Swiss-Prot record:
Deletion consequences: Reduces mycelia growth rate, fails to produce perithecia, and shows drastically reduced virulence on barley heads.
InterPro entries to which the protein is assigned, alphabetical: Chitin_synth, Cyt_B5-like_heme/steroid-bd, Cyt_B5-like_heme/steroid_sf, DEK_C, Kinesin_motor_dom_sf, Myosin_head_motor_dom-like, MYSc_Myo17, Nucleotide-diphossugar_trans
Underlying gene: CHS5
GO process annotations (BP): chitin biosynthetic process; fungal-type cell wall organization
Signal peptide start and end residues: none
Protein name listed in UniProt: Chitin synthase 5
Originating species: Gibberella zeae (strain ATCC MYA-4620 / CBS 123657 / FGSC 9075 / NRRL 31084 / PH-1) (Wheat head blight fungus)
Enzyme Commission number(s): 2.4.1.16
Job description of the protein: Polymerizes chitin, a structural polymer of the cell wall and septum, by transferring the sugar moiety of UDP-GlcNAc to the non-reducing end of the growing chitin polymer. Shows additive effects in septum formation with CHS1, CHS2, CHS3, CHS4, CHS6 and CHS7. Indispensable for perithecia formation and regulates conidiation. Plays an important role in the response to cell wall stress. Also required for hyphal growth and pathogenicity.
Length: 1864
């Protein structure tokens, strides 16, 4: 039969033919079809048809709603509406589910056509629900669409949009609901935006569309512009140019907000959504740096790596951190800590990794991805809850399937996203091929209809290889992820599966040869290749396993668990977050994943009976049964969600595979009619109206369009109608004869339909959709223009708003926006998703005010709420009286600082923190008071006792004679010393009259005679006036200091130049006064000085009338000897005035005469003169008779001041001398004899690297001490991977010691130091023998692993807790107290495995993990203990291994050396070394004679294990200097014992090499020193005598520590004094300074430590740092702690209540039992067979934590701890022999498998041990014991329980053996 396909294109050229199958056969090739598409494209016909249910659409990159004539006809929009009309028609008339599937590459316009299609479908509904469904689609696109290199609207999530209809009552379906199913959002884009692309559009909407007030609240206001742009670069928004790409983000945000509001999201929720989006942007802005954690935490005792702080990663921009924390409802500190750590499961162990900045950046990215994924899931699920109809009411659905296009290369670098995306496209393409080629093949065959075969490219190999359940690629990836396999193991699994078995998948090599190498190494670029239908793609395997697991670390979940934000709690509480809980503590979330599949399954057809009159056929029944099966699977999926934590979890690939399977079943279901829309892009450059034939031809070839077209030319069947149904649709009443088949053939012959559209089968007719519409009389609805469309129902005129008025953008019409297009798509006035909704906009108008956060909590309030902790009362106590007195003193000293200021300005909300700050201020005030007192005694006290005098004796004056080498040129005039040298240049009248040489001859002399005075001008006499003729002779002093009266003839010849008295021709009465005024104020250097003895001598021997009045010396000798005369001008007669020359009062003259040579101040004060006369006399004395001041520089008072300071200096110097003598310990290091004492060697380990740990362990092991008598004890503080390490510290230690990973002992409970519930910790015990360089040393490793509920840093409690583990154990051993389960295991391991009774150990040798000890160190220390039984502890000399590491380490070398060899050696003289460093010390555990516990005595253990550390003093004692405090406790409670320093015992440690760590370490040391010395001073037991008691030395040390800054300032002051006044050299001070370092130099010279010369110079240069900068910094940062969450509040009646957010610890939660009781029970439960001993079930379970209660009484869920011995195991480098005969019967060698931390997929859903045991018993009852095997029993159990039991294999085997042997 010739094919005559209808020519519906109308008249015209070839381009008028829209149907490709209608083209001639010779035009059915790829090339010809492409040419045909091009011809249509160039005349603005961008669409073509393959059949009635397949459309081809070319993206024009212009308006997709305009056809060739400018109208809608012929456009892509019209084509989409045509498909919508057809689907709606079949939905109503046949009650079939409809599916519209989109295919096409990215940029082909799928999103645009989908928008038009959805609009057309929704326009057919008259309910307001259509608006909501349209808005839901917009919200989905906003959240999942981005701009890529190929399109501005690239969808990055698979969409299954289901419209739900009720078709039971009418042929016009009623829209009753909708459902959005998202498939695998491209999460990698969130934190890694590809270059030239954008992140998801909603993030740009937020930045551009918020108002200024909203931006301020969200923290987005940094440099924002008016047009929605910003100068600030946002990491998660890509390059700043992506903010301006022609998309109107601002309008998009308004539409997004309004869409949410119309979807009934409350205003508060919309605001919360915006806050989460903003927090994601801010997370991208976080900057990280490596720093040292110098603030000690509440749980951390510090102490590791010399207490310099742990290297951590911190956030640099704390302001951004606070914004994120506020929006998430958590504290900033918690968020920073969480981002710096990451908890993982490694080898079934929960381990915390300390991240570097890059790791922290990635962790922050994980948080951002998690937040966005959960937000999208929550929004979509919320929409679904409000739009989805009940399942029972849904009759049929229309489903739109649109997945991202095929991805040849992944822009984000995520191989997983690329693989899953391409897997989806592969699956969709395959179901497309099935629909066209295979779907009806079986039915055609059964109906005996033959159709010509058509060859086509079949991608079934690729589909099976990728998607086959069980052994497809995605299934293998999921399985390998569940099994914690590596990437290379995954690659090998693929090789085993696909090599030679599937041509579509090729697996690369896991090994490769590097260039220039002949050896195979791991191939870092290993990959596998998949031959997709669209091309080959190489997928790298590196990181694929980890990416597939998509694990959200427990750290983030633990942090979010404490959120104060209800919205954030809801996000993390939804079903999309699949949590993995601990097998024993269901409340403990170990980790989680965000689901990669939809939270809902596709809906199914309602089970209601079909409408009356509708035929019910076998086909319909088959369809119904298939849908029921799908419904059951859907219900199972819903049920599985509720029990997610009880079933093994899938990885991303497994979940995605399951969702694809659901989708494929829904689309390919027999009751579903599918339409396909092929979207093609005309060119790769997004150029409008340009057709690239090569580009299009490649797409035509890829999608097999030519083969599909050829297939449709032979078979285009869309329906099968049984003859009865077919005839019922036709007008066949006129045909009265013939069978149904004959009548049907007659109808078909009459219609003259082409053969490819209709065929008659055995029981019915196959029809195309066109033929069905014609026969059903629906063809009249076909619109003009030749398209199968416009089939609007009779309800089309329902008054709905037409699509042209719906505001959703030309987006979906114009994919390349040519300007500032609104939204992300286009103009508001064009067609799209939205229809008008006439409901009130009142709810939306709430946003009109420009601030959606108005009346909501501010960011500050959120931050404050996030920082609040949920506290619980844990303890109640009263303050001690001493504490009360101290608090009173603190408030007395800081009363002027209001509490409000401390709280607001200092931002200290907690009262205990404010109190600590006040204490710090008070302590600083006291310190500065002491410094001020010290400074006063050094400088102020001498000046107060002996004020400085600027006086010169005659001899001193003569030394200033101006000669070469002299100090200057001074002269004296009437008692005033003048600087002649400076005056000479200003001498008038200059050198012409008197030369400078002549003037310099006066230097060093008294030149009073050169300056005659006018008496009347300087003195008023008795009556107020003296005749001007009165003159007075002058007196000089010679250079020998002897006074001499000069006769008139001895008057200096130059005096005439200064003689302006009345009797001269040039009389100037005031000339002398004016000249002296200038001298005194410009050139004065001091005054002449006369000692009291010298004054007395002058009066006695020379008959001088000289006295001292108030420190001034006056001489009236000349006056009293008649030295006054009258001198008139030449030619004038001398007047006769009686008494003119006696102008002084007689009483004054008499005073000089009667008391000459004496101090007459008292007489002067009591002289009987009126005040006026006395004032006149005093003026006359000062002007005429003053010759100098009284010189008291050598007085008794001044001598006392000088010698008082000297005495103190000598006292301090004597201490230095004693220190020097103490350091002079000469003689060789005598090698002690071999000793037989047992010693424990303890190493606390935290995050040290392997080299440091190995050096420390090896140095202890290689010590020259009997190996059998030393025990290595390594305490690992938590499961933490330090920065730079690849394994957790415990694993590093165990690897060093040779412990195999298969050894996995049970974690056991013990008491720890921590807040609240952290006092309950758990640990594992390992033991064995360590062999190194011929030494075989027993060891015990204690690993603190933490409780199952601990997520972050499990087990970590600090160094002090590590010490307490051993101290508390030994304390209970020696006092025979009840022990915790872990301590019982320690006892067992030491006694029964190592073979030594724990009580035998006498000494505890403690070093740090970065310390290396000398081979003879322990021997020398123990020898000292044996020699002196009163010695309780000692330390050795610690040097530096990294001395030349940096300048910071260099300045410490000499300080380390001298602090040991001076300070500690001196303290050792008194037997009271006040600080035994924890890095290298040995302690006596018990007294040698009596066995009395010493180091582990009750008092020391109780005080050292103090948990309530809530005051500044206690924090400085226990958190800063626990080593020093431990020494303080030894001196306090064992005062009769000694602590010593042994210089012969040596060790080497690592000093801080960075300034921050060094500063932190010294802050710890200085502050702990101050607080510990305060503790020591009151002790009465400190030994000594007189001043040289230890108490005095302690006080001196305390004082010197405090006043160090003043000492440095004093040295600077001395240097200044010497520099400013070279004549004054403080010889004593410099002698003392010289003695200090001179004696030190003698020490290292005598010891031939020549290198110390250089180190000492560097140390001296750094004195300002050590003695000034560090103390000041330390004192002020005394309260620099992380105060934790425990605080103290005021209670009733003066009581204090301790509250904590860690919960209240119940001591009874840790069972305890004495060793004897435990041992007896152990004997009872052990068989009498001679086997090796292990822990009993009683020890392991009865005394383990109560959390294990739900498990079986028999062996629980954990395995007992295994001994380290190789007996029965054979592990290398482990126990090969027992050190002593075991006292216990043998070892059952850990029969019962398991571990503390099972991998989640193995443990959840497992049967209990009781159930397994019962079934094993039942199996063995009926089994043939001669043939039964363990494997067979396991298989039978798996069959019975229907779960794999690999994780229980060990238990099954051991239980089987126990039952067979009769043990059970």
């Amino acid at each position: 039969m010739a094919m005559s396909l209808p020519q519906l294109g109308g008249a015209g050229g070839a381009h008028t033919q829209p149907s490709l199958p209608s083209l001639p056969a010779h035009l059915q090739s790829d090339t010809h079809l492409t040419a045909h598409l091009a011809s249509r494209f160039h005349v603005s016909h961008p669409t073509a048809r393959l059949s009635s249910h397949a459309l081809i659409s070319l993206n024009t990159y212009t308006n997709s709603s305009k056809g060739p004539d400018g109208g809608k006809e012929g456009s892509a929009m019209a084509g989409a509406e045509d498909i919508a009309d057809r689907a709606f028609l079949r939905l109503g008339h046949r009650s079939e589910n409809q599916a519209i599937v989109f295919l096409g590459e990215s940029g082909a316009g799928k999103s645009t056509i989908r928008a038009h299609l959805l609009t057309a479908l929704l326009n057919k509904s008259s309910t307001p629900l259509s608006t909501k469904l349209s808005l839901a689609a917009y919200v989905f696109d906003s959240l999942t669409t981005t701009k890529t290199a190929t399109t501005p609207t690239a969808s990055k999530s698979g969409l299954f949009y289901e419209l739900q209809y009720d078709t039971s009552a009418t042929t016009n379906p009623i829209l009753i609901g909708g459902k959005l199913l998202d498939h695998r959002l491209e999460r990698s884009r969130i934190a890694d935006v590809p270059t030239g692309e954008r992140n998801f559009h909603v993030l740009y909407y937020l930045l551009a569309g918020t108002s200024e007030a909203e931006k301020s609240h969200l923290g987005l206001d940094g440099g924002s512009g008016a047009a929605g742009t910003t100068q600030k670069r946002w990491k998660y928004l890509g390059h700043p140019t992506q903010l301006k790409v022609g998309i109107n983000d601002a309008e998009g945000f308004q539409v997004f907000k309004n869409a949410l509001r119309k979807l009934e999201f409350p205003r508060a929720e919309i605001a919360e959504i915006c806050q989460i989006l903003a927090s994601i942007l801010h997370i991208g802005q976080l900057e990280f740096e490596t720093t040292s954690q110098t603030s000690v935490t509440g749980d951390d005792s510090g102490g590791f790596s010399h207490e310099g702080g742990t290297t951590v990663t911190a956030v640099k921009n704390k302001d951004v951190l606070s914004i994120v924390a506020a929006f998430l409802g958590v504290s900033s500190a918690d968020l920073q800590t969480t981002l710096g750590y990451k908890t993982k499961m490694i080898h079934r162990e929960r381990v915390t990794v300390m991240l570097d900045p890059n790791g922290a950046r990635a962790h922050a990215g994980e948080l951002a991805r998690t937040l966005y994924s959960l937000l999208v899931a929550w929004i979509l699920e919320t929409i679904n809850q409000r739009l989805c109809a009940p399942e029972e009411s849904i009759a049929n659905t229309v489903s739109i399937v649109d997945f991202p296009g095929f991805c040849q290369q992944t822009p984000t670098g995520s191989a997983l996203d690329q693989l899953l995306n391409n897997a989806a496209t592969e699956s969709i393409y395959n179901l497309t091929l099935q629909n066209f080629f295979d779907r009806k093949a079986d039915m055609l065959e059964s109906e005996e209809v033959s159709v010509a075969a058509t060859s086509y490219f079949d991608n079934s190999d690729a589909v099976r290889g990728i998607l086959k359940p069980g052994n497809g690629l995605l299934s293998i990836l999921d399985d390998q992820t569940r099994r914690n396999r590596t990437d290379m193991q995954f690659l090998e699994a693929l090789r085993r599966r696909f090599d030679g078995k599937n041509a579509a998948i090729e697996v690369g090599s896991a090994q490769a040869k590097l260039p220039g190498s002949n050896f195979l190494t791991e191939n870092t670029s290993a990959c596998f290749t998949v031959k997709h239908f669209a091309g080959e793609v190489d997928y790298p395997v590196k990181g694929l396993i980890e990416e597939n697991s998509e694990v959200i670390s427990g750290d983030l979940l633990n942090m979010i668990n404490g959120t104060k934000s209800e919205f954030v709690a809801r996000l993390f509480g939804q079903d999309a977050l699949q949590t993995v809980t601990h097998p024993t503590e269901r409340t403990t979330v170990m980790q989680a994943t965000v689901s990669s599949k939809p939270m809902r399954a596709p809906s199914v057809m309602s089970r209601k009976t079909t409408r009356a009159g509708r035929p019910s056929t076998a086909h319909r029944r088959q369809q119904q049964e298939a849908l029921e099966e799908l419904d059951r699977e859907s219900q199972v999926g819903e049920s599985n969600k509720k029990n997610a934590n009880m079933t093994p979890e899938q990885g991303a690939s497994g979940q995605f595979l399951a969702s694809l399977d659901n989708l494929q079943k829904a689309v390919t279901d027999p009751g579903t009619n599918s339409y396909f829309i092929f979207c093609l892009k005309p060119n790769d450059r997004r150029i409008a109206n340009q057709f690239d034939s090569k580009c299009v031809r490649m797409q035509v070839q890829t999608f097999g369009i030519a083969e599909i077209s050829q297939r449709l030319r032979s078979a285009d069947f869309s329906l099968f109608l049984p003859f009865g149904e077919f005839l019922g649709l036709t007008d066949s009443e006129t045909i009265l004869v013939g069978s149904e088949r004959e009548r049907a053939e007659m109808v078909i012959e009459e219609k003259q339909w082409p053969q490819n559209e209709v065929r008659v089968g055995a029981t019915g007719v196959f029809l195309s959709e066109r033929c069905w519409m014609e026969i059903a009389q629906l063809g009249e609805a076909v619109s003009v223009g030749g398209r199968y469309g416009g089939l609007h129902s009779s309800d089309a005129g329902d008054g709905l708003t037409p699509a042209e008025s719906i505001p959703y953008g030309v987006s979906k019409e114009n994919l390349v926006s040519g300007g500032n297009t609104p939204l992300m798509y286009g103009e508001k006035s064009k067609g799209g998703y939205f229809t008008d909704d006439n409901r009130s906009e009142a709810g939306v108008s709430a946003f009109g005010g420009g601030d959606m956060f108005k009346n909501l909590d501010t960011r500050e309030q959120m931050a404050e709420r996030g920082n609040e902790k949920s506290l619980e009362e844990v303890e109640e106590y009263r303050d001690k009286p001493s504490r009360k007195r101290w608090v009173a003193l603190v408030y007395f000293l800081t009363w002027f600082i209001p509490d409000f200021a401390v709280r607001v300005i200092g931002r200290m909300s907690r009262k205990d923190v404010r109190m600590a700050w006040r204490e710090k201020v008070a302590i600083n005030m006291l310190i500065w008071l002491m410094c001020a007192v010290a400074a006063f005694f050094m400088v102020g006290f001498p000046m107060l006792i002996c004020p400085k005098q600027y006086v010169y004796s005659s001899g001193e004056l003569s030394s200033y004679d101006g000669e070469k080498g002299s100090k200057g040129a001074y002269v004296a005039i009437r008692g005033f010393v003048i600087d002649l040298e400076n005056f000479i240049p200003n001498h008038y009248p200059g050198s012409d009259l008197v030369s400078e040489t002549t003037l310099m001859k006066y230097a060093g002399k008294d030149i009073t005679s050169l300056f005659p005075v006018q008496v009347s001008a300087l003195c008023q006499g008795k009556d107020g006036a003296i005749p001007p003729e009165v003159t007075l002779d002058n007196r000089n002093t010679n250079m020998t200091g002897q006074p001499q009266l000069l006769a008139q003839r001895d008057v200096d010849v130059n005096s005439v130049y200064h003689d302006f008295r009345y009797g001269t021709n040039d009389s100037r009465p005031d000339w002398y006064f004016e000249q002296m005024y200038t001298f005194k104020h410009v050139y004065l250097k001091g005054r002449m000085g006369y000692t009291p003895k010298y004054v007395e001598k002058l009066a006695r021997d020379s008959a001088w009338n000289i006295v001292t009045i108030h420190g001034k010396v006056y001489d009236m000798t000349k006056y009293m000897q008649g030295g006054l005369r009258m001198k008139t001008k030449p030619g004038e007669a001398t007047p006769n005035i009686p008494g003119a020359t006696d102008f002084m009062e007689d009483s004054v003259v008499q005073l000089f005469r009667s008391a000459k040579g004496q101090d007459v101040s008292k007489y002067w004060d009591n002289i009987k003169l009126s005040a006026v006369k006395k004032q006149r006399m005093e003026t006359c004395l000062n002007n005429l008779f003053y010759i100098g001041d009284s010189d008291t520089r050598n007085s008794t008072r001044c001598q006392f001041a000088e010698y008082f300071i000297l005495a103190i200096s000598v006292l301090l110097a004597s201490i230095l001398v004693f220190k020097f003598l103490a350091a002079l310990q000469f003689g060789g290091k005598n090698v002690p004899e071999n000793l037989d004492k047992f010693v424990m060697c303890m190493i606390p380990a935290y995050t040290e690297d392997e080299d440091s740990l190995r050096r420390a362990i090896d140095s202890l092991s290689r010590m020259k001490y009997d190996d059998k008598r030393k025990l290595l004890v390594v305490v690992c503080d938590g499961m933490i991977i330090g920065q730079g390490n690849d394994r957790p510290t415990p694993r590093i230690v165990l690897d060093i010691l040779g412990v195999s990973e298969t050894v996995d002992p049970e974690p056991l409970s013990f008491e720890a130091l921590g807040e609240g519930m952290k006092q309950h910790n758990m640990g594992k015990i390992y033991s064995g023998l360590y062999e190194v360089q011929g030494h075989i040393v027993p060891f015990m490793v204690i690993v603190k692993v933490g409780k199952p509920s601990e997520v972050a840093r499990p087990g970590n409690r600090g160094k002090r807790d590590s010490q307490m583990v051993l101290m508390r154990f030994l304390n209970r051993v020696h006092y025979n107290l009840a022990m915790s389960p872990m301590e019982l295991e320690m006892y067992h391991q030491i006694r029964n495995i190592i073979g030594v009774n724990p009580t035998f150990y006498e000494y505890l040798f403690q070093i740090d993990a970065d310390t290396v000890v000398a081979p003879d160190s322990a021997t020398r220390m123990i020898s000292a203990f044996i020699d002196d039984t009163r010695l309780i502890a000692c330390c050795g000399e610690t040097a530096l291994t990294n001395a030349k590491g940096s300048f910071i380490t260099m300045i410490q070398v000499y300080e380390y050396w001298i602090s040991h060899n001076l300070s500690k050696a001196f303290e050792s003289l008194f037997g009271s070394v006040t600080c035994l460093p924890g890095c290298f010390s040995m302690y006596r555990i018990r007294a040698a004679e009596t066995g009395k516990p010493l180091f582990v005595s009750k008092e020391i253990v109780e005080d050292y294990s103090t948990i309530r550390v809530d005051t500044l003093h206690m924090k400085n004692l226990l958190h800063l200097g626990e080593d020093r405090y431990l020494t303080t406790l030894l001196l306090k409670y064992h005062g009769k014992y000694k602590t010593k320093y042994l210089y012969s015992a040596q060790a080497w440690t690592i000093a801080p090499d960075s300034w921050a760590v060094f500063l932190s370490q010294r802050r710890r040391w200085i502050n702990s020193t101050v607080h510990n010395l305060v503790e020591l001073i009151p002790l009465a037991e400190l030994c000594g005598f007189c001043c040289f008691s230890m108490r005095f030395v302690v006080f001196v040390d305390l004082l010197s520590t405090i006043v160090q800054p003043v000492i440095v300032m004093y040295i600077v002051y001395l240097i200044y004094q010497v520099a400013s006044n070279p004549s004054v050299v403080p010889i004593t001070a410099f002698l003392l300074l010289g003695a200090i370092y001179g004696l030190q130099a003698i020490i290292f010279i005598l010891r031939r430590k020549w290198e110390m010369v250089g180190w000492m110079i560097m140390y001296i240069a750094a004195i300002p740092v050590f003695s000034f900068g560090l103390p000041l910094y330390s004192f002020w940062h005394m309260d620099d702690f992380n105060w934790g969450n425990t605080r103290v509040i005021a209670g009733e009646s003066g009581k204090k209540i301790v509250v904590s957010d860690e919960g209240k610890f119940d001591p009874n939660s840790i069972p305890r039992k004495k060793w004897e009781e435990y041992q007896a029970e152990l004997w009872e439960t052990q068989t009498q067979t001679a086997r090796d001993d292990v822990r009993s079930e009683i020890s392991g379970y009865s005394y383990a934590t109560k959390a294990q209660g739900p498990f079986s009484d028999y062996h629980g869920g954990y395995q007992p701890s295994r001994p380290g011995s190789t007996a029965g195991f054979g592990h290398p480098n482990m126990s090969r022999m027992s050190l002593a005969h075991s006292e216990m019967p043998g070892n059952r060698a850990s029969q019962f498998g398991g571990s503390q931390f099972f991998s989640p997929e193995e443990m959840v859903g497992m049967p209990s041990d009781d159930a397994l045991l019962a079934e094993i018993r039942d199996i063995l009852k009926t089994a043939d014991l001669m043939t039964v095997t363990k494997k067979g029993i396991k298989q039978e159990l798996e069959r019975r329980f229907n779960v794999p039991l690999d994780a229980k294999r060990a238990y099954i085997n051991s239980a089987t053996e126990a039952l067979l042997s009769g043990q059970l």
